[in-house]
Curated annotation (Swiss-Prot):
GO cellular component terms attached to this protein's record: cytosol
Molecular functions per Gene Ontology: ATP binding; metal ion binding; threonine-tRNA ligase activity; tRNA binding
Primary enzyme class: ligase
PANTHER family: THREONINE--TRNA LIGASE, CHLOROPLASTIC_MITOCHONDRIAL 2 (PTHR11451:SF44), THREONINE-TRNA LIGASE (PTHR11451)
Keywords: Aminoacyl-tRNA synthetase, ATP-binding, Cytoplasm, Ligase, Metal-binding, Nucleotide-binding, Protein biosynthesis, RNA-binding, tRNA-binding, Zinc
Predominant cellular place of this UniProt entry's protein: cytoplasm
UniProt-listed Enzyme Commission number(s): 6.1.1.3
Taxonomic lineage of the native organism: Bacteria, Pseudomonadati, Pseudomonadota, Alphaproteobacteria, Hyphomicrobiales
Name recorded for this polypeptide: Threonine--tRNA ligase
Stretch list, region Catalytic: 246-549
Length: 658
């Protein structure tokens, strides 16, 4: 019995088909060249194998190598080829899982002898052989009994465990590539040959089965793959550049911070690192003041009862650090927790004292220190820690004020990123997930407002801000905006958020009195610009490769002497520079000037002013900029005039120049 489906194509055309043709047959009906290039097809946003029949009407697209969605298919197939190569080369190795991740893929293997970096070269060679064989991917659907029996016979105990964990009503799909097969949901491309040669195995690491330290340790092989060689080369070059810019290495060289075993994920800030951190806070404090935020501070330790009301105790307890009063055991009901988030405390501040509609919008901000438990293996310098500071704010407003508040937040976020040199920003709106609080009418209303705001932002930016909508990706308590910035070497960092919350005001019975003297629940907006300030500082260090803008540098200027004859002049010069607000350090050490210059350059000091006998006699300096070999002779007045504006933060510069 034939089935009629109506398909809409990307060019706007529509066509009816009177049989359950496959995706490949559809591609062939359009053109032979398209069928040859086709990797998969998308029906109503869901990517499927080309061998799958088209059983329903909707929006259809044939995915080729040029499509951005092809990258996930290429990497997914590459992970399967990696697993086959390993089992060909190292019989007895068990395969476990091999997902696609950001910028690549990995596969975890169970083997008595862990793999080494030398093994990767051999495995990669075998992968190229398998790809060259150009074996078709073929899907079969098995019963649970059959899958269990076959994988048990193969000695694949981890696969058997996975089979047992799959819900009874879910199909068990197995994909073949030649004789080798693996349990997999799919989809896959037509054959291994479509993977191409633009891939590379990157590293070996240990990983616990299912991420649980109580389970066996596996060996994880990481790899990456791209649609073409040029993209692979560009990515590998970016990794080389990222290694040079690694904030952990620069943090040591610049003497900014360190970590110790006694405090995993806890930062020991040194003088210059702490100065940089304070520069970040001072900048944001001024911006908050300009946008009428009230800065507050809520307790770091609160009773579990508050976290139970907020829902954190139920949903986030495993990531919270708990505390108890002295001499009381853990079974005691009187348990406290270090705050993992600032929002419950801010709701308490809003609730303190009766609020009228005339008090709204109320904007509450805090540089709130939070503690969150992260597994030790996931800790990564400033980027992933257990204790960090959020530039957190919460806005309580009326429904009518929501759009204006979102636009106000957007202006603050974009201008902040621009002040730090980030020009390429993307903005995503995440909408309702399946599991959520609040009525459909409430979500409809909120999403309509935020979509309108999104269009306004896109129009105002003249297309410079890339916007998109992510259906189903919102939090259970409200839709959200996510701001992602691109750094100097093309990496993307998600930082800012604007998150609506239908949940907390209701849980805590937060209200205001409207103009009709009725109690109303306020609209609550969670807002962050930097997110984790420590992480943002790590991003800045890597973005600038430690060469911070003069206004943000922890040490702006060093005055270095060539000879002791210039010491008195250098002291007076340092005092004068400090008097006009320039952060200046004096170096009178009895060392050669080239040694001093090299040392301060390694410390990434933006400006070095060299003073010798000639400079002291002519009231001048020899100025050297970080990264330049040029020597510029200037009078002291010229130096001050040139550096003072540059050393002024951009937000203050705007006020001065207004």
């Amino acid at each position: 019995m034939s089935c009629s489906v109506s398909l809409s194509f990307p060019d706007g055309s529509k066509r009816d088909y009177h049989s359950e043709m496959t995706g490949l047959e559809l591609a062939e009906s359009i053109s032979k060249s398209l069928a040859k290039k086709a990797l998969a097809y998308s029906l109503n946003g869901i990517i499927r194998d080309l061998s799958d029949p088209i059983k329903q009407s909707g929006q259809i697209e044939i995915i080729t190598r040029e499509d951005t969605r092809a990258l996930e298919l290429i990497r997914h197939d590459c992970a399967h080829v990696l697993a086959e190569a390993v089992q060909e080369l190292f019989p007895g190795t068990q395969v476990t899982i091999g997902p696609v991740i950001e910028n690549g893929f990995y596969y975890d293997f169970a083997r008595q002898q862990p793999f080494t970096l030398d093994d990767l070269t051999i495995i990669e060679k075998k992968m190229r052989e398998i790809i060259q064989r150009n074996k078709p991917f073929r899907k079969e659907v098995w019963s649970r009994k059959k899958a269990r029996e076959i994988f048990s016979e193969k000695g694949e105990l981890y696969k058997v465990e996975l089979i047992d964990s799959i819900p009874d009503n879910q199909d068990l799909k197995v994909y073949y590539q030649g004789d080798w097969f693996d349990l997999c949901r799919g989809p896959h491309m037509q054959s291994t040959g479509q993977i191409g040669n633009a891939f590379k195995l990157m590293k070996v690491a240990g990983a616990y089965w299912r991420g649980d330290a109580n389970n066996p340790m596996l060996t994880r092989i990481y790899g990456t793959a791209f649609a073409n060689e040029n993209d692979l080369k560009a990515y590998l070059h970016m990794l080389e550049e990222a290694e040079k810019r690694d904030h952990r290495r620069l943090g040591r060289e610049m003497n900014l911070f360190h970590f110790q075993e006694e405090g995993p994920g806890m930062i020991f800030w040194h003088k210059k690192g702490w100065k940089m951190f304070q520069n970040l806070i001072n900048y944001m404090r001024r911006r908050l003041d300009d946008h009428q935020y009230a800065e507050v501070n809520a307790p770091q330790v609160l009773d579990r009862s508050l976290w139970e009301i907020s829902g954190h105790w139920e949903w986030y307890k495993e990531n919270m650090f708990k505390a108890i009063p002295a001499a009381e055991d853990w079974d005691n009901e009187n348990v406290y927790a270090l705050k993992p988030m600032n929002c419950p405390g801010h709701v308490q501040i809003f609730k303190h004292g009766l609020k009228s509609y005339r008090d709204l919008p109320t904007r509450i901000a805090e540089f709130g220190v939070v503690h969150r438990y992260e597994p030790s293996g996931s800790l990564h310098g400033l980027m992933r820690v257990r204790c960090f500071t959020q530039d957190d704010a919460h806005i309580f407003c009326t429904d009518e004020q929501l759009a204006d508040e979102c636009l106000n937040i957007n202006d603050l976020i974009l201008s902040t990123y621009a002040d730090f040199g980030f020009k390429e920003i993307s903005l995503k709106l995440s909408t309702r997930p399946e599991k959520r609080v609040g009525s459909d009418a409430l979500w409809d209303h909120a999403e309509n407002i935020m979509e309108s705001v999104l269009k306004t932002i896109e129009t105002k930016s003249a297309g410079q801000i890339k916007t998109s909508i992510l259906p189903g990706e919102g939090a259970f308590y409200g839709p959200k905006f996510e701001y992602t910035l691109k750094d100097a070497i093309g990496r993307e960092w998600q930082c800012g958020t604007t998150q609506l919350d239908f949940n907390l005001p209701e849980r805590f019975n937060a209200f205001y009195i409207d103009k009709d003297s009725e109690k109303r629940q306020p609209v609550m907006i969670h807002r962050a610009i930097f997110g984790s300030m420590e992480r943002f500082l790590g991003i800045l260090i890597e973005n600038f490769s430690g060469h911070m803008p003069l206004w943000f540098a922890p040490e702006q200027i060093v005055v270095a002497t060539i000879t002791s004859e210039a010491n008195e002049y250098a002291k007076k010069l340092t005092a004068k520079l400090k008097s006009v607000g320039l952060s200046t350090t004096l170096d009178l050490r009895n060392e050669k000037i080239n040694y001093k210059i090299r040392e301060h350059s390694l410390q990434k000091v933006p400006v070095i002013l060299v003073c010798g006998k000639r400079e002291s006699e002519t009231n001048s300096v020899n100025m050297r900029r970080l990264g330049s070999t040029e020597q510029i002779f200037l009078s002291v007045e010229e130096v001050i005039e040139q550096l003072k504006n540059e050393a002024t933060p951009p937000d203050l510069r705007r006020v001065i120049n207004a």
